[in-house]
């Protein structure tokens, strides 16, 4: 029996000395810096680049071009005036949202839903993500002209 105890004790071998290269100490939760929140204003996240619009055209030709964009991009499949379809009612859109916010939502809806609290609430209430339809910077003023012409 003593032989067994001797063999077991010797089999353990020497214990390594603790070194400073061992696992790093874990910081207490209070010492870990919090992730900063993104501050978003009424225009949406400013890291989404948009074309600055000095003026939204209101002439009939621009409004007509905007309707073509609205139809070609399939906007009417989800949006209407005076009623809610899949997406929000567009009546009075420019009185509820800023032009930069609308541009950002149309041109980068995924980022808006992730970073903008208003877009997140719209996503929650409508239960569907607005798809990115590829509206170009050149098409945007015409699309806004059409939307604004339909009702404020």
Regions found by a protein language model. Name each.
Residues 1-8:
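Sec-dependent bacterial lipoprotein signal peptides
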Residues 10-14:
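Bacterial signal peptide processing site
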Residues 19-24:
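Juxtamembrane extracytosolic/periplasmic "stalk" immediately C-terminal to the first targeting helix
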Residues 26-71:
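Electrostatic cytochrome c docking/interface patches
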Residues 63, 67, 80-111, 131:
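Gly/Gly-Pro-rich "capping" loops immediately C-terminal to redox-active cysteine motifs
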Residues 66, 72-81, 102, 143-147:
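The canonical Cys-X-X-Cys-His
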Residues 100-105, 128-152:
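C-terminal capping alpha-helices of c-type cytochrome domains
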Residues 111-131:
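Short, flexible, glycine-rich and Lys/Arg-enriched loop motifs at helix boundaries
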